[in-house]
A protein has these predicted regions:
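N-terminal accessory alpha/beta regions
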Residues: 1-23
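Short acidic, glycine/Ser/Thr-rich loop/turn "cap" segments at secondary-structure junctions
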Residues: 18-26, 41-48
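Alpha-helix capping at helix-to-loop junctions
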Residues: 21-28, 65, 69
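Short, flexible loop segments at the rims of nucleotide/cofactor-binding pockets, characterized by
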Residues: 24-32, 158-165, 186-189
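A short, well-structured juxtamembrane/interface segment
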Residues: 27-43, 165-176
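SIR2/sirtuin-family catalytic core signature
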Residues: 159, 170-256
Length: 256
């Protein structure tokens, strides 16, 4: 499909406006979630090393920041989190370096709303002024016609092509391929469009997959779901747990 050049600015404007509205509707502002909630969740994450996410929002990022703050204050000693973005390329922008700089990592398998690419360079925007909301920083990037890097929903082969076109996303998926030990998944459906993730886990040295199941189905539906996921990993051990028992999102479980 070809677009007339005169329609392109209008299309770009509509995409930007739609993206901002989506972020505003789905992403909580800092004032909506207290710091003690993020710190409590950071404590619940204590047993995890690398965390892989396919979510685009920055909720998990705020949890790892809370984790690092607790360590800096010497309230906890849980091991710092990083996400591979450490190189200061300009004010408020960090370029990707490596996942091995910090002992624990948050890895965005499908990228995130605050990760952008300009002239082939992938960078993460970060706050210089703590009072500024991330949505405002994202708005500035959009106003400069810079759009977030993200792997859109669609066919598995299309997703895989998008990942291979971006250095950071390739490194993120390769990190999953090279992992070992047990893998706990939470809120991930292992759908057909995420075959690249299933393939990465199957090619890794992961020994056991512990997958969450939300029990809002009939017994036969749950049985079918368990069988479907188990069959995706013929050479791995697969176990399941009730997703409601994993984390406490309604109130801080730990007081800080």
């Amino acid at each position: 499909m070809q677009l007339e050049s005169k329609n392109l600015p209008l299309l770009i404007s509509e995409v930007k406006e739609g993206l901002i509205k989506t972020i505003q509707a789905t992403h909580p502002q800092a004032k909506d979630i207290r710091d003690n909630m993020f710190r409590s969740l950071a404590k619940e994450f204590e047993t995890f090393t690398d965390i892989y996410t396919t979510n685009y929002d920055i909720f998990l990022y705020k949890i790892i920041l809370a984790n690092n703050t607790l360590n800096q204050l010497k309230v906890e000693n849980m091991g710092d989190f990083g996400d591979g973005f450490f190189e200061e390329i300009s004010s408020g922008r960090l370029g990707f370096q490596d996942f091995d700089i910090k002992p624990r990592n948050l890895i965005y398998l499908h990228s995130s709303l605050f990760i952008f690419n300009q002239n082939g360079n992938t960078y993460k925007i970060h706050k210089i002024d703590g009072k500024v909301e991330y949505i405002n920083l994202i708005q500035i990037e959009l106003d400069n016609n810079n759009f977030p890097v993200y792997v859109a929903e669609g066919r598995a082969d299309k997703k895989y092509m998008e990942i291979n076109d971006n250095y950071y996303l390739r490194m993120a998926l390769n990190r999953l391929k090279k992992r070992n030990g047990d893998l706990i998944t939470f809120g991930f459906s292992f759908g057909k469009s995420d075959k690249h993730i299933v393939d990465a886990i199957n090619s890794s040295d992961t020994s056991i997959i512990v997958a969450s199941i939300y029990p809002d189905k009939t017994e036969s539906q749950l049985s079918a779901e368990i069988s479907r996921i188990t069959n995706l990993f013929p050479n791995k051990g697969v176990q399941f747990f009730d997703s409601r028992t994993m984390f406490t999102f309604d109130f801080p479980k730990y007081a800080y």
